[in-house]
From Swiss-Prot:
Record keyword DNA-binding present: yes
Gene3D superfamilies, per database record: lambda repressor-like DNA-binding domains (1.10.260.40)
Domain of life: Bacteria
Pfam family, one: RodZ_C
Organism listed in the record: Yersinia pestis (strain Pestoides F)
Biased composition (Polar residues): 188-225
Alphabetized PANTHER family for the sequence: CYTOSKELETON PROTEIN RODZ, PTHR34475
Name of this protein: Cytoskeleton protein RodZ
Membrane topology: Single-pass type II membrane protein
Length: 345
């Protein structure tokens, strides 16, 4: 009976139990054993409880047990037969290895996913390109329509762009008009429509002499031309008023010097660096200018503010309103027809 009991006790003593008993007999703790073997405390606990870790290979597990046995002075020959008996049981618990077909399925699925992603990217790029092309074609068609309208207006005006303004409005300020000369001296011109008196009007106002009186025709003509040239330089403010002495010549007033600058108040000044189609409409709906201007031209327009401008090529000109520059940078960067309102208070 004692022999059978000892055999049962030997069989029931697993490697973990024997290692734990040897550790306790030496007075060591699990923490001490773990530090000496450079293992985790949980690994030492699993070895003593005979719990094989699923993610740990059997080779490493046996190596840990051998190191543990050497530390607590247990012979390896007593533990290895017990480990060999437990090996089939542990081998049955090992999960089967995945086949290569599963990896191929994953790769195939990843390939389809990448193909679908590239397809979406190509569709987005195609739609973006189509949208840009449609906008570009619409802009080109709009510019071509403006050019056709301008060409039709040029053909009606005899090939010259003529701004549509009132007779008394200074739509285009003359810049290179020569000044008249009286007695060898330049005479300033004024912009008042009622201040200019022509030579023919002066001539008609001279009373005709009768044939009975001898008249020196040469002196008469010279006097008439001198009077006509002098009267052309007289502004309305210089006309003698009733009650003023007629013997003294009228003095020049301040209106004669500032008449040219007064007409530029509220005016638009445009300097063209290249050929450009332009249309300007004032607040009354009157078209001040509509046509093509050549590069190097300077256009001065005056009307009732605000002005509505349509510019075919914003980068081909610079605009200033009342001496202040007008910003066209956003239209130049967008490379499109500029539609803006200038002079809004």
């Amino acid at each position: 009976m004692n022999t059978e009991a000892s055999q049962d006790q030997t069989v029931t003593e697993t490697p973990g139990v024997r290692l734990r008993q040897a550790r306790e007999s030496l007075g060591l703790t699990q923490q001490t054993v773990a530090e000496r073997l450079c293992l985790k405390v949980s690994t030492i606990r699993d070895i003593e409880e005979d719990n094989a870790q699923a993610n740990l290979a059997s080779t490493f597990h046996r190596g840990y047990i051998r190191s543990y046995a050497k530390l607590v002075h247990l012979p390896e020959d007593e533990l290895l037969p017990i480990l060999e008996k437990q090996a089939p049981v542990r081998a049955a618990k090992v999960a089967p290895m995945q086949s290569f077909s599963l990896g191929k399925k994953h790769k195939k699925r990843d390939g389809w996913l990448m193909s679908f992603t590239w397809l979406i990217v190509l569709v987005v790029l195609g739609l973006t390109g189509a949208w840009w092309w449609q906008n570009h074609q619409a802009q080109q068609a709009e510019i071509a329509n403006m050019v056709d309208q301008s060409s039709a207006q040029l053909s009606q005006n005899g090939g010259q762009p003529v701004p549509l303004t009132d007779d008394n409005s200074d739509a285009i300020a003359p810049t290179d008009a020569p000044a008249p000369v009286a007695n060898g001296q330049p005479v300033p011109l004024t912009n008042h429509s009622g201040s200019a008196i022509t030579n023919s009007a002066t001539t008609s106002s001279v009373p005709k002499t009768t044939s009975t009186e001898p008249v020196d025709t040469a002196n008469t003509n010279t006097t008439m031309h001198q009077e006509g040239a002098a009267s052309a330089a007289v502004s309305p403010s210089q006309v003698p008023q009733p009650g003023m002495p007629t013997g003294q010549p009228p003095l020049p007033t301040a209106d004669a010097g500032v008449s040219g600058s007064a007409s530029s108040v509220g005016a638009l000044v445009m300097n063209f660096t290249a050929d450009c189609w332009l249309q300007v409409v004032d607040a009354t709906g009157k078209t001040l200018f509509s046509g093509i201007q050549k590069g190097g031209a300077v256009l001065n327009l005056a009307g009732k503010a605000p002005y509505k401008l349509t510019i075919g090529a914003p980068g081909a000109l610079t605009i200033s309103y009342q001496g202040n520059p007008v910003d066209l940078s956003k239209f130049i960067k967008a490379n499109r027809v500029a539609r803006l309102t200038v002079g809004v208070e």
